[in-house]
């Protein structure tokens, strides 16, 4: 963790906060994550075919994810060395590269569209907007469930779309950032428990859990800090208490931390029973002392907490860089 890396990260966070993922750019260019997805598809098609034993499928899945991670890491090393040779221009290109893999503004924009859709077009508008960011069947959601889904998506993706990429870049530079994004892409594509991927995707899912472990805990603390600045000390205290108590109620070992913290920060109940691909997932509600009926205003409150949490994180990285720059 060098001063240069931290400084680049801070500037990249600010750039992503302002510009996000502009449609005019990515309608003309292919986003790097799309290439990562194509690499995952290639490995899936090459290794996950035919009839194999469970153990052999797991082994092939381990080989597949290691190949993908090695490729992403090697690309990160090449880019880091190239940018280093290019001097100031290279630093600028590295800022842009890091910003591309962050999701502050794009995430907040997607979640805010759910609130806007509900206000403009009622339940149909909210369902359409939330279907862009969650995997559950939107037609099974009433308005409070749409609001909960949006808030849960915001909290979970704060961890793996903002905090985790920033964390791994700070720790391991571009190789760490690209390896994390490849792993996270693989987990989203092959890390689920469908019959096809239960064994082949096992290694990707477990490694993703491990890689997100520090970021998930940091996300809960950052959400509590954001709640402190936007909603007061009591909201921050509740966010910490609910995160510590209820994170284990979630089926994911990591997602429960930011979601429970956001439930406490906004004062609403989150999680609970929901339907994915026609299959009902029964989970208890997080923050069972909170309001049972989430509303549009709760989405908007969550977005303000999210942005405050992002600001706290950016300030923390800047504060960490300062003594390294001075001494």
From Swiss-Prot:
Gene Ontology terms: biological process: cobalamin biosynthetic process
Entry keywords, A to Z: Cell membrane, Cobalamin biosynthesis, Membrane, Transmembrane, Transmembrane helix
UniProt membrane topology term: Multi-pass membrane protein
Pathway(s) annotated for this protein in UniProt: Cofactor biosynthesis; adenosylcobalamin biosynthesis
Subcellular location, record wording: Cell membrane
Predominant cellular place of this UniProt entry's protein: membrane
Pfam name, any one: CobD_Cbib
Highest taxon, organism lineage: Bacteria
Disulfide links within the chain: none
Annotated Gene Ontology cellular component terms: plasma membrane
Residues annotated as transmembrane: 63-83, 84-104, 158-178, 305-325
Keyword Chloroplast found: no
GO molecular function: ABC-type vitamin B12 transporter activity; threonine-phosphate decarboxylase activity
Family per record: Belongs to the CobD/CbiB family.
NCBIfam families: cobal_cbiB
Function: Converts cobyric acid to cobinamide by the addition of aminopropanol on the F carboxylic group.
Entry-linked HAMAP family: CobD_CbiB (MF_00024)
Record's protein name: Cobalamin biosynthesis protein CobD
Organism of provenance: Rhizobium meliloti (strain 1021)
Gene that this polypeptide is encoded by: cobD
């Amino acid at each position: 963790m060098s001063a240069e890396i931290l400084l680049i990260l801070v500037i990249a966070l600010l750039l992503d906060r302002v510009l996000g993922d502009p449609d005019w750019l990515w309608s003309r260019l292919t986003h790097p994550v799309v290439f990562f997805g194509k690499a995952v598809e290639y490995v899936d098609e090459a290794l996950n075919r035919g009839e194999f034993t469970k153990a052999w499928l797991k082994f092939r899945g381990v080989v597949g994810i290691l190949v993908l991670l090695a490729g992403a890491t090697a690309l990160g090393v090449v880019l880091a060395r190239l940018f280093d040779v290019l001097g100031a221009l290279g630093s600028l290109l590295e800022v842009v590269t890091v910003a591309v893999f962050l999701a502050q503004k794009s995430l907040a924009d997607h979640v805010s569209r759910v609130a806007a859709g509900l206000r403009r077009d009622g339940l149909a508008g909210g369902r359409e907007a939330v279907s862009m960011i969650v995997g559950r069947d939107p037609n099974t959601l009433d308005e409070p469930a749409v609001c909960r889904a949006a808030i849960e998506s915001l909290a979970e993706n704060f961890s793996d779309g903002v905090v985790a990429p920033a964390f791994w870049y700070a720790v391991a530079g571009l190789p760490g950032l690209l390896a994390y994004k490849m792993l996270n892409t693989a987990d989203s594509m092959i890390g689920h428990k469908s019959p096809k991927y239960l064994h082949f995707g096992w290694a990707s899912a477990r490694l993703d859990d491990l890689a997100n472990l520090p970021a998930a805990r940091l996300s809960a603390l950052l959400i509590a800090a954001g709640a402190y600045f936007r909603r007061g000390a009591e909201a921050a205290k509740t966010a910490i208490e609910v995160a510590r108590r209820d994170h284990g109620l979630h089926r994911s070992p990591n997602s429960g931390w930011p979601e429970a913290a956001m439930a406490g920060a906004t004062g609403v109940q989150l999680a609970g029973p929901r339907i994915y691909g026609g299959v009902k997932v029964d989970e208890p509600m997080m923050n069972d002392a909170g309001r049972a009926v989430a509303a549009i205003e709760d989405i908007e409150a969550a977005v303000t907490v999210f942005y405050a949490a992002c600001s706290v994180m950016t300030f923390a990285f800047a504060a960490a860089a300062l003594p390294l720059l001075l001494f």
